[in-house]
């Protein structure tokens, strides 16, 4: 999920930031709307960076790692050092399960696996997740530190964070 928590600034901040570059002040709402559309259409993004947004999001860890790789932001993530992680894992939909691409090392084939093969993959993933979480709980029950017990958890485990961008 993605939930907007808070924001600072808005349309007025965006248009004022854009107009400062040519010394113009406040205009009408209609002109402001036109300017915002113009900025978006022509990819003039710096005025939009004047607005600060804070989101609460939840996603599998492997998605989270890709997300922050491509965007500079401030974030506070749930910590497996301080919290017992919930048993919630990502299992891809059957139509998203495909073989490794033969010509793209980073991707998969465009055609999904057969429904039968996809069902088998989903069952194997679920079984692996259940076993990993069972081991995690057993380690915690033995008194192993959370920061060590969590290493058995797969990247498909869901995480959540507050993510702030400008």
Question: PLM features: residue spans?
Answer:
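Family-specific signature for flavin-dependent thymidylate synthase
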Residues: 1-166
């Amino acid at each position: 999920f993605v939930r907007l928590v808070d924001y600072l600034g808005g349309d007025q901040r965006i248009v004022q930031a854009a107009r400062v570059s040519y010394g113009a002040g406040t205009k009408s709402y209609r002109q402001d709307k036109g300017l915002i559309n113009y900025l978006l259409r022509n990819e003039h993004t710096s005025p939009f960076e004047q607005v600060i947004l804070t989101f609460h999001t939840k996603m599998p860890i492997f998605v989270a790692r890709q997300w922050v790789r491509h965007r500079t932001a401030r974030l506070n993530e749930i910590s497996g050092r301080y919290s017992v992680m919930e048993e919630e894992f990502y299992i891809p939909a059957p139509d998203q399960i495909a073989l490794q691409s033969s010509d793209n090392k980073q991707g998969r084939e465009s055609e999904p696996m057969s429904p039968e093969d996809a069902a088998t993959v989903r069952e194997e993933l679920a079984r692996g997740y259940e076993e990993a979480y069972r081991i995690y709980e057993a380690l915690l029950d033995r008194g192993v530190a959370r920061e060590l017990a969590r290493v058995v958890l797969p990247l498909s485990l869901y995480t959540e964070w507050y993510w702030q961008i400008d």
